[in-house]
Amino acid sequence: LTTSASFLEDGNEISKITDLIAWNKYYGWYGGSAADLAKWADQIHRNYPSYKLGISEYGAGASIYHQQDSLKPGDPSGWWHPENWQTHYHMENWKAISERPFIWGSFIWNLFDFGAAHRTEGDRPGINDKGLVTFDRKVKKDAFYFYKANWNKKDKFIYIANRRCV
């Protein structure tokens, strides 16, 4: 099988060449709401029922030092990247993905925060903070435990989210 990962508009000619197609989608981070992924996927499936649809990238930035009581998105190109928004974002996106059997796969962007010299956002310049674990690999963010609870049925645990919000 051949596959393509795309950030191009839906229905672009490149989408018709490969057996499988996946799109980078950041609804709820770079515009829109976290619930928009479900609407987009349903629309693509309706318009192009023969497409084998995947999500090649999805994620939202988060700093373990940015805590808030309210559930409001951060500014993707700014410094405020609240951890609770990242968790909400992943919960909404995973719900949309897991409820749609026509989505063949999805890929979280990213397991770890990573260096990105051109970035000046989040709590430190030069870091992409969309990871589920901090750059130094020492702290697992709340969204990490959301996926662990959904994907690992053997390791029973209780995790209290928003525990850093004091």
PLM-predicted stretches and their roles:
Residues L1-V166:
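Extended substrate-binding grooves/exosites of carbohydrate-active enzymes
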